[in-house]
């Protein structure tokens, strides 16, 4: 019997989590909370408008830990990090809410979003419509759908639920087959290419460059993972990729927002980003 991959273990846990959460808070109650949540801030539109100007459209990630790296940031105050990112020029935020594998929390999303005016994506492993409604109830503006974790029917169902509650969708792919499935099944303009293989956690920027010619021009290609220095950013710009999701490079820096500036807006680096206490 083969050993389950990290992704397979995470997905199995998510089904358990949905059962546990829905026993505590009903879907009907979540739907009520979703209707009273703050209006969505336009996650997709913010990225598209920035990328149209050929300026870096950065989704800056708030992430305490990961399965492959363990704890990434010891001093972890989501609201402070969010403010630092906003000052540093982020277009959107990504907040990990997975508890078991990334040491995330729903409260982190709420704290980060309350501290800034930026749109926020709930970064988690979506397997059930319950989680989508829950994301809107928490105040999220967008959800992530990972193609390798979903079949086409479930992917379409989750996207339809997102649309119903007013959430944008970022669909994430890692290879050509997943890209083909995503383009066929969903009409979201946001196509994220994860340079990290979620089964092995190996990273290669070639993943984005290989898939880029197959992403239609009316979709926005977002490169995710493995952007560590200016050379990586410039490589993407040469290939007309202006949208990025970056987490670890920022989380390891003393001042995440200043690191964002250094990486994406070096000409603007000044003493404007306050140190985190």
From Swiss-Prot:
The keyword Heme does not apply. Its EC number is 4.1.1.48. It comes from the Bacteria. One of its GO terms (molecular function) is phosphoribosylanthranilate isomerase activity. Keywords: Amino-acid biosynthesis, Aromatic amino acid biosynthesis, Decarboxylase, Lyase, Tryptophan biosynthesis. Pathway: Amino-acid biosynthesis; L-tryptophan biosynthesis; L-tryptophan from chorismate: step 4/5. CDD domains: IGPS. It is an enzyme of class 4 (lyase). It holds the Pfam family IGPS. Gene3D superfamilies: Aldolase class I (3.20.20.70). InterPro entries: Aldolase_TIM, Indole-3-glycerol_P_synth, Indole-3-glycerol_P_synth_dom, Indole-3-GlycerolPSynthase_CS, RibuloseP-bd_barrel. One of its GO terms (biological process) is L-tryptophan biosynthetic process. It catalyses: 1-(2-carboxyphenylamino)-1-deoxy-D-ribulose 5-phosphate + H(+) = (1S,2R)-1-C-(indol-3-yl)glycerol 3-phosphate + CO2 + H2O. Belongs to the TrpC family. HAMAP family: IGPS_B. PANTHER family: INDOLE-3-GLYCEROL-PHOSPHATE SYNTHASE, TRYPTOPHAN BIOSYNTHESIS PROTEIN. This is Indole-3-glycerol phosphate synthase. It comes from Pseudomonas putida.
